[in-house]
Amino acid sequence: MDKGHLPPSRTALRAAKQQPRRSVWKVALATTIGAAAVIFGVVFYASPFESSFPVLVVEEAAESQSLQSEPVAAEPEPKQPVTFTLVAGGDVLTHIPVANSAWNGESYEFSRLMQPVSAYLEGADLALCNMEVPVGEPGAAPTGFPIFSAPYETPAELVKAGWDGCSTSSNHSVDQGYAGLVRTLESFDAAGLGHVGTARSQEESDSPQLYQIERDGETLTVAHLAFAHNLNGLDFPSDAPWAINLNDTARIITLAQQAREDGADLVVVSYHCCEAEYISYPEQQQIDVANDLAASGLVDIMIGHHAHVPQPVELLEGGPTGEGMWVAYGTGNFISNQSTECCVEQSSSGALIYFDVVLDPDGEVTVPEASWTAITLDREYGHVMRVITAQGSEGASTPQETLVRRHSQVAEVIGTVASERTEAPTTDGTTRVVPRNR
């Protein structure tokens, strides 16, 4: 800065530093001629000070006032942790009776059947399901067991119900051949529904489904991976070996590592396994894979599918922060026609598993809590989904004692590590489905 244009406060400070030097010289002069000053009646000592000292006082006061009037920058508010909520649900099985209940005369309105539980999906920042079956041609009637095809509009109906994405790798992935697999992904893309586990190219197979969640000024990037155990003996597309992710722990870890290197804050793995169905405990293969993923330090959450009944929720040692990896060995069915008539009573119910994901100001991501909500199918009311509590479910056609028993079955299996959630979550965040590489 040009010294001839210093601010007034800087000038005042300079005057304050120079003034004492003038005062000392005058004191010395007054001492030398003091006697003469008395004789002539002139207070020579004082007069120079009378012209300068008051100026100094005024300048100091002005400087003080100037310093006091300068605005003081407010301390920025410290950043607070931001909590995101992720919910995982079970198998979407569009059995023919379910599809018939969804038919409104023009289309298959599955979202109407799911409406009673939609708040429990929409209130989460990210909702992930398992699409058990491929979709058929537009306008084609659905098919059921053993070679499934869901109505083409099913993915759009899942979005209306509150889902953000689904795993698509299962033992039914190629029920409609490779063409059906591709059609399923195209229908997901058209609906804006995320998908992972099946692919149309090697590049897509190697790409996780990413979700970017914005909330309270922060962004959380979630990577979703999915794998299945077999294809029910159907032929694997020989010219498209990358079309389905089959269970391979080493590859899961490799893709999880790549996802983190590419910026994922949270890695979720959907694991469709194993041979047995309708059992309420995990098989050894599930346990081994879960422990391997936890030990890798790359996976935050593992979600199990295929058993069609709920299985335990556990917090395993390991995980990215060393504070553990959550595993829900089985989420049961989300929507289906299964019941005691074909299977076991527990197949009429499922669980929505919630995870609290905390993003700290320093950028660290942890998953300190898990919770669950029991759901069931009210077949007597046209396959409408219901949230059930220890008191049953208000408005259901299924007898309340049956609903209370189903809730008890879910609670007993899931265990006590996760707490029960009886109210829907809420969020003011936004979630973006990032298109997978192709």
Regions found by a protein language model. Name each.
Residues 2-17, 23-438:
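Acidic, metal/ion-coordinating pockets
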